[in-house]
Amino acid sequence: MNATDWSTIVRLVADGVGVREGDRVSVFFTDVAVMDAVAAFVDESWRRGAVVQVVATDERFDSSALRWAPLDVLSAAPPLEAAAMEWSDVHVSFRAMTTPIVDADPARIAALRRGRGLVSTMRWERTRWALVRVPTPQWAAAMALDADDVVREWAASFDADWAEAARRMQALCDHLSGARTAVIEDEWGALEVGVEGRTWIPFAGNVNWPDGEIATAPVDDAVSGRIRFPGAFSFGGVIVRDLELELVDGLIVAERATEGLALVSALLDADEGARRLGEFGIGTNAALTTMTGDLLIDEKILGTAHIAPGRAYPECGGVNASSLHWDIVKDLRGTGGGPRGSLRIDDEWFIRDGVVQPVLSEVAVGSPPLTAPA
């Protein structure tokens, strides 16, 4: 498979959300860079007997909204996007990895994200959905990455027997059904995440592309410690660098960053649930190795773990409600200037001193799994 093999890719996406005859399918796209993907998916959906509507949600227009719109308008669900969720049985959003320059008051950016988060909640509750993140040369250049490498890894990440991957990951999730505590640790600190009584679920070719992770919803008041995310990533058009979070009894009580701190604080103050975690996840896609700065891709990398302040997956037993759901990725492999780290769940090592252990590598998708040394 290569980056332009859209016919294969969109069949995987359509299979993942179960597009079938009579379905009402809404499609969003954030930039013309993904138009070939959108066209291929629309054609595939019509071929299957669905009714398809396409909405342009180009993120470049956000700058005008941020400049002129009142706060109450920014923080409300965009009406056309909300109407699409009410109409749809299936929703797919093709999101180009672009680098819009957002220069606005962080409180206004957070308000805009809050409005979009309301649409995301509708998407979760009402539709069978998928997000497809697509790399671009512009993104690679902005993040000082080799564009060919990023595209090559991205294309390879689709190439798996997803039904078999789902079986393997489900078996691991079943194994974790009695787990009590997950711990992420490195030389900068440790974060203890309570997961007792929660359900783990596999993401294996259904709601996000690239895909490949297992995840659960932390117990709301059972997360404590400190975690640091070295390096830079982008959220809402703003670069956040060297983020550090401190949690006590499930609540984020302090945040620090060398860049983007004002946005971080504004996002975490969005509503009552934004300072509690809604997700704890572990990446399982071995085809992805490069931290791109795009959270939707990086969270799938084998050797990483991630947390998400905000809205919890109810299917995991999570009850935290928020307009925010913000995945933040911790690279435990020691790449990109950060130290090697470890992940254990109860007394079982999943990643130890930067090395993926067999319990995790054996469920990996993509290129041949990594194996811990004997």
Task: State what each model feature region is.
Residues 1-225, 360-374:
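Active-site bordering "gate/hinge" segments
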Residues 10, 176-177, 220, 236-239, ...:
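Short solvent-exposed loop/turn micro-motifs enriched in small/polar/acidic residues
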Residues 32-33, 97-99, 136, 198, ...:
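Short, glycine-/Ser/Thr-/acidic-enriched flexible segments
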Residues 41-47, 199-200, 243-246, 272, ...:
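Short, solvent-exposed amphipathic alpha-helical segments in soluble enzyme
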Residues 86-88, 92, 187-198, 204-221, ...:
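PLD/PLD-like phosphodiesterase catalytic module centered on the HKD motif
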Residues 224, 254-321:
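Dual-mode signal for accessory low-complexity, basic/Gly-rich regions
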Residues 293-371:
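Internal helix-turn-beta structural module
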